[in-house]
Curated annotation (Swiss-Prot):
<dbReference type="InterPro" id="IPR044049">
    <property type="entry name" value="EccD_transm"/>
</dbReference>
<feature type="transmembrane region" description="Helical">
    <location>
        <begin position="250"/>
        <end position="270"/>
    </location>
</feature>
<keyword id="KW-0812">Transmembrane</keyword>
<keyword id="KW-0813">Transport</keyword>
<comment type="subunit">
    <text>Part of the ESX-5 / type VII secretion system (T7SS), which is composed of cytosolic and membrane components. The ESX-5 membrane complex is composed of EccB5, EccC5, EccD5 and EccE5.</text>
</comment>
<feature type="transmembrane region" description="Helical">
    <location>
        <begin position="359"/>
        <end position="379"/>
    </location>
</feature>
<dbReference type="Pfam" id="PF19053">
    <property type="entry name" value="EccD"/>
</dbReference>
<feature type="transmembrane region" description="Helical">
    <location>
        <begin position="137"/>
        <end position="157"/>
    </location>
</feature>
<keyword id="KW-1133">Transmembrane helix</keyword>
<dbReference type="GO" id="GO:0005886">
    <property type="term" value="C:plasma membrane"/>
</dbReference>
<feature type="transmembrane region" description="Helical">
    <location>
        <begin position="480"/>
        <end position="500"/>
    </location>
</feature>
<comment type="function">
    <text>Part of the ESX-5 specialized secretion system, which is responsible for the secretion of EsxN and a number of PE_PGRS and PPE proteins, including PPE41.</text>
</comment>
<keyword id="KW-0997">Cell inner membrane</keyword>
<feature type="transmembrane region" description="Helical">
    <location>
        <begin position="224"/>
        <end position="244"/>
    </location>
</feature>
<feature type="transmembrane region" description="Helical">
    <location>
        <begin position="413"/>
        <end position="433"/>
    </location>
</feature>
<dbReference type="InterPro" id="IPR024962">
    <property type="entry name" value="YukD-like"/>
</dbReference>
<keyword id="KW-0472">Membrane</keyword>
Length: 503
C-alpha cells in the first residue's frame, strides 16, 4: 500500500507591486508637468486622457497646446525618444516614481493608397487630389454671392419697370430690399472675426448699395431724367464713401464707385440746372478726367495719409531738432497724457503705401470707365464734323497708352493700356453698328484684328529690349504731343471758338 504525502513548502514572501507612479511628463517648450499614472494599466489606455490633461495644463500656463501634424499617433516616450510599448504597463517597462517621460506625436511611416476598382473611382480619386473640395467657408461665400446676384437682378428688374412706368412700386420695393440687405451686412460686419467673415460681409454690403441707389433715383416723380440721375448717383457716391471710411477694405472698388458716381452726378446736375448739351457735358468730363490722371498719384498719397518729409537745409539745422512737418500740439481726452506724433514706423509706411496703391488703382479704373463712355458717346458717325471726335479719341488713346509706362505696378499700367485699347474698339464697334455698310464693317473688322495683333507684337518685343535714354526721352515727348491737342480739340468740339468769334 502506497501513501502519498504532500511535501512541506517553504514560506514565500510576496512582493507587492506599486499601483501608481508619479512621473514628470515633458511637453511644449521646456514645460514639465507632474502627473499620477496607473502603474499596471497598459500605456495605450492612458495616452489619450493624458494628452487632454497635458493640453489643459498648457493652456493654463499660456503655452500652445499639442497638436497632431498629419497622420500618426501619440506615444509616451523615454527621455531619449524611445517610445514605450503600448501593450505593456509602466511597471513592466521599469518606469517608477520620479522618472521623466516625453509625450510626442510619431508620424505614420506607412503609406496608404486607395484601391481603384472602376474607372469612375479613378476619375473621382484623381479629381479629389487636383481640386479642393467645398469647405464651409467657401460654401458661405458662394451663398452670399448668390444672394448678392439675386439682389442685383431684382434691382435691375425694378429699375426697368421705373424706366417705363411712373409709379412708386420701384421705390418701395427697392427701399425694403436695400434696408434688409444693409441690416444683414451690418450684423455680419459686427460679428466678423476672420477675413472670410469680413469677405462675406463686404459682399452683402456692396450688394446693398445698388437697391438703395435705385430707390433714391426712383423717388422723384416724372420721367427718368437728370433729377433722378443727380439723386441716384449722389446717394451712390455717399454710400460708397461711407463704406470706404468705416470699413477700410476694398479701397479700390469703393474708390472706383466714388469717382464714377461723383463725376456722373456733376454732369447730371449741370444738365438739370443749366440744360447743358450732351457734347459739352461729355467734353467737360473728358477734360476733368485728363486733369485727374495727372493729379491721381498726389491724390492717392493724400488719401492714404502719407506726408512728404521736408527737405533739410544745407546747414542741417533739423538734424537735432523736431522736424517741422510733424505736429507740435496734440488734442487728447481728459485725464490722458499727451503724446506727440513722431516719424512713421516701417510698418506704418508699408501700410500707407499699400493703401495708396489701392486708392490709385481705383482712381485709374474709375477714370478709365468715364473716358471710355465719354469718347464712345462723342464719336457719333451721323454728325457733320465726325472727324473731330475721331482725332480727339486717337490723341486720348495715345496719351493713355504712353502714360501707362510711368507706373511701377503692372496692373495700373495694364489699366491705362487697356483703357486706350477699349476706346479704339468701342468707337469702331459704334461706327460699324450705326453705319451698317459693307465698307464700314470691313474697316472695323480689320482694325479690331490688327490693333490687338500690333499690341501683342509690341508686348513681345519691348520688354526684352534695352532702349537708350534719348529714345526714352523721345517717347516721353510723343506722350506730351498726344496730350497737348486734347484741350484745344475738346474746346473746338464744344464750339467755344465759335462762341468767342461771334460774340
Amino acid at each position: 500500500m502506497t501513501a502519498v504525502a504532500d511535501a512541506p513548502q517553504a514560506d514565500i514572501e510576496g512582493v507587492a507591486s506599486p499601483q501608481a507612479v508619479v512621473v514628470g511628463v515633458m511637453a511644449g517648450e521646456g514645460v514639465q508637468i507632474g502627473v499620477l499614472l496607473d502603474a499596471n494599466a497598459p500605456v495605450s489606455v492612458m495616452t489619450d486622457p493624458l494628452l487632454k490633461v497635458v493640453n489643459s495644463r498648457l493652456r493654463e500656463l499660456g503655452e500652445a497646446p499639442l497638436e497632431a501634424t498629419g497622420r500618426g499617433r501619440w506615444a509616451l516616450c523615454l527621455v531619449d525618444g524611445a517610445p514605450l510599448r503600448a501593450t505593456q504597463s509602466l511597471t513592466e517597462q521599469d518606469v517608477y516614481d520620479g522618472d521623466r517621460l516625453w509625450i510626442r506625436f510619431i508620424a505614420d511611416t506607412e503609406r496608404r493608397s486607395q484601391v481603384i476598382e472602376h474607372i469612375s473611382t479613378a476619375v473621382a480619386s484623381d479629381l479629389s487630389k487636383r481640386f479642393a473640395r467645398i469647405d464651409p467657408i467657401v460654401a458661405v461665400q458662394v451663398g452670399a454671392s448668390m444672394v448678392a446676384t439675386g439682389v442685383v437682378l431684382a434691382t435691375g428688374v425694378l429699375g426697368w419697370w421705373r424706366w417705363h412706368h411712373n409709379t412708386w412700386l420701384t421705390t418701395i420695393y427697392t427701399a425694403v430690399i436695400g434696408v434688409l440687405v444693409l441690416a444683414v451686412a451690418m450684423l455680419l460686419l459686427m460679428r466678423a472675426k476672420t477675413d472670410a467673415d469680413r469677405r462675406v460681409a463686404d459682399i452683402m454690403l456692396m450688394s446693398a448699395i445698388m437697391p438703395v441707389t435705385v430707390a433714391a433715383a426712383a423717388a422723384p416723380p416724372g420721367p427718368v431724367g437728370s433729377p433722378q440721375a443727380v439723386l441716384g448717383f449722389g446717394v451712390l457716391t455717399v454710400a460708397a464713401a461711407l463704406a470706404l471710411r468705416f470699413t477700410g477694405r476694398r479701397l479700390g472698388i469703393y474708390t472706383t464707385i466714388v469717382i464714377i458716381g461723383a463725376l456722373t452726378m456733376l454732369a447730371a446736375l449741370a444738365r438739370m440746372v443749366a440744360a447743358t448739351s450732351a457734347v459739352t457735358l461729355l467734353s467737360s468730363l473728358l477734360l476733368i478726367c485728363v486733369v485727374a490722371y495727372h493729379a491721381a498719384p498726389a491724390l492717392s498719397r493724400r488719401l492714404a495719409g502719407i506726408r512728404l518729409p521736408v527737405f533739410p537745409s544745407a546747414t542741417s539745422r533739423w538734424v537735432f531738432e523736431a522736424r517741422p512737418d510733424l505736429p507740435t500740439t496734440v488734442v487728447v481726452s481728459g485725464g490722458s497724457a499727451p503724446v506727440l506724433e513722431g516719424p512713421s514706423s516701417v510698418r506704418d509706411v508699408l501700410l500707407q503705401a499699400e493703401r495708396a496703391r489701392s486708392f490709385l488703382s481705383g482712381l485709374l479704373t474709375g477714370l478709365g470707365v468715364m473716358v471710355v463712355v465719354c469718347m464712345t458717346s462723342l464719336c457719333d458717325p451721323h454728325t457733320g464734323q465726325r472727324w473731330l471726335p475721331l482725332i480727339l479719341a486717337g490723341f486720348t488713346s495715345g496719351f493713355l497708352l504712353l502714360r501707362g509706362r510711368s507706373y511701377v505696378d503692372r496692373w495700373q499700367s495694364i489699366t491705362l493700356a487697356g483703357t486706350a485699347v477699349i476706346i479704339a474698339a468701342a468707337v469702331c464697334v459704334r461706327y460699324a453698328l450705326e453705319l451698317s455698310s459693307p465698307l464700314a464693317v470691313s474697316i472695323v473688322a480689320a482694325i479690331l484684328v490688327l490693333l490687338p495683333a500690333a499690341g501683342m507684337a509690341a508686348a513681345a518685343h519691348v520688354p526684352h529690349t534695352i532702349y537708350s535714354p534719348l529714345f526714352r526721352k523721345f517717347v516721353e515727348w510723343i506722350e506730351y504731343l498726344c496730350l497737348m491737342p486734347i484741350f484745344p480739340l475738346a474746346l473746338w468740339l464744344m464750339n467755344v471758338y465759335a462762341a468767342i468769334r461771334y460774340r
